[in-house]
């Protein structure tokens, strides 16, 4: 689709950006584009650049067969240099010579308040009507507001309308059976970067540690907000999350399965050049950096999406609370450049002193007995 023929750059506003892409939100009146985001590539050095066409093929041919129900639908659209140049890029440099962009649904479309929890976990609270706030945009609660100041702000903008949905945005990172290390790869990297502990993604994989993992995730939600969600609005977040994780085919288990290294040549420690980076390793490294939107939503019998055939198996009834729709979407499937192997090696070298260390402020990660000849990470 030649998107520049049905819309103008002025109808797209800056929404968010990552390391490789920038997102624009549609604000015009075209029904087809409403509730959509346009993903455009940020400027990269030519040798590290992966074209949008190559990325699109990678997602459709390599990733979607693995996660046919979780990966959001994307559409390849044709751009022009003039169109890209006129986008409100908020000072970011775009890859203006790239002829293609990606059109995708806006999972956060609607009235959501963002609650920053940690680098790899955000919370979004959705209400059924717009809440008017004095000088505060509900979609962009400042992350710098913490502690008492943040609680004060929350009380001032208390939810006067019913909360009908909760979304967790999580980057699960590396998922595998930790055999012997005190800290998993993700927790080790977070310590290396100087972050405070929030949760260990490995806890979400095993029945005996799920509750601990969920308690850790929920621990950074202000208590009054958690009560507002779980008790006042009767969305039993922990119970819903546990039901989601107890499904043996949940997305965390699937990611763990497809991140598994089955060939010793694909172990990062064995890579010596770009020629050692196989297609399988590129896929694995992509899956180790994806993001998830996990949504718990009150069932609405008048909502056609809730009643669709695709969601028959996603409806959960909880006694005393009612019926809920549980959905999960995967995003951020960026094919990794083979040139990143140097960065991977450098990072692994820095992590060696952390894997088996003991940090009094960081609980050791779960260890499991392995009977499957696991080659490691």
UniProtKB/Swiss-Prot annotation:
It comes from the Eukaryota. Coiled coil: none annotated. The lineage of its organism: Eukaryota, Fungi, Dikarya, Ascomycota, Saccharomycotina. GO terms for cellular component: nucleus. Has kinase activity and phosphorylates inositol-1,3,4,5,6-pentakisphosphate (Ins(1,3,4,5,6)P5) to produce 1,2,3,4,5,6-hexakisphosphate (InsP6), also known as phytate. GO terms for biological process: inositol phosphate biosynthetic process. This is Inositol-pentakisphosphate 2-kinase. It catalyses: 1D-myo-inositol 1,3,4,5,6-pentakisphosphate + ATP = 1D-myo-inositol hexakisphosphate + ADP + H(+). PANTHER family: INOSITOL POLYPHOSPHATE KINASE 1, INOSITOL-PENTAKISPHOSPHATE 2-KINASE. Its EC number is 2.7.1.158. It is an enzyme of class 2 (transferase). It is found in: Nucleus. GO terms for molecular function: ATP binding; inositol-1,3,4,5,6-pentakisphosphate 2-kinase activity. Gene3D superfamilies: Inositol-pentakisphosphate 2-kinase, N-lobe. The EXKPK motif is conserved in inositol-pentakisphosphate 2-kinases of both family 1 and 2. A motif (EXKPK motif) lies at residues 169-173. Transmembrane segments: none annotated. Belongs to the IPK1 type 1 family. Keywords: ATP-binding, Kinase, Nucleotide-binding, Nucleus, Transferase. It holds the Pfam family Ins_P5_2-kin.
């Amino acid at each position: 689709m030649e998107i520049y023929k049905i819309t103008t750059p002025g109808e797209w506003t800056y929404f968010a950006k990552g390391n490789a892409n920038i997102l624009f939100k549609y604000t015009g009146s075209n029904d087809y584009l409403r509730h959509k985001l346009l993903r455009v590539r940020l400027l990269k050095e030519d040798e590290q650049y992966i074209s949008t066409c190559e990325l699109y093929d990678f997602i459709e041919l390599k990733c979607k067969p693995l996660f046919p129900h979780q990966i959001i639908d994307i559409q390849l659209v044709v751009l022009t240099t003039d169109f890209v140049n006129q986008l409100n890029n908020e000072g970011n440099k775009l890859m203006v010579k790239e002829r293609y962009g990606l059109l995708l649904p806006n999972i956060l479309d609607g009235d959501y308040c963002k609650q920053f929890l940690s680098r790899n976990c955000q919370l979004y609270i959705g209400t059924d009507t717009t809440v008017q706030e004095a000088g505060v945009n509900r979609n962009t609660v400042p992350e710098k507001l913490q502690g008492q100041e943040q609680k004060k702000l929350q009380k001032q903008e208390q939810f006067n309308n019913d909360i009908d949905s909760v979304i967790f945005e999580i980057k699960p990172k590396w998922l595998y059976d930790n055999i012997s290390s005190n800290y998993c790869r993700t927790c080790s990297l977070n310590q290396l970067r100087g972050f405070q502990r929030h949760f260990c993604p490995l806890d979400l994989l095993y029945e005996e540690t799920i509750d601990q993992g969920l308690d850790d995730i929920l621990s950074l939600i202000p208590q009054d907000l958690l009560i507002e969600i779980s008790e006042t609005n009767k969305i039993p977040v922990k119970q819903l999350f546990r039901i989601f994780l107890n499904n043996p085919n949940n997305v965390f288990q699937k990611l763990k399965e497809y991140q598994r290294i089955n060939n010793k040549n694909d172990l990062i420690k064995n890579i010596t050049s770009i020629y050692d980076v196989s297609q399988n390793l590129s896929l694995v490294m992509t899956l180790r950096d994806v993001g998830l939107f996990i949504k718990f939503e009150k069932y609405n019998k008048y909502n056609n999406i809730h009643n669709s055939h695709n969601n028959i198996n996603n409806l959960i009834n909880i006694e005393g609370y009612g019926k809920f729709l549980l959905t999960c979407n995967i995003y951020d499937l960026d094919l990794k450049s083979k040139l990143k192997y140097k960065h991977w090696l450098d990072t692994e070298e820095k992590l060696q002193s952390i894997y088996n260390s003991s940090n009094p402020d960081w609980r050791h990660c779960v260890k499991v007995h392995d009977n499957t000849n696991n080659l490691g990470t």
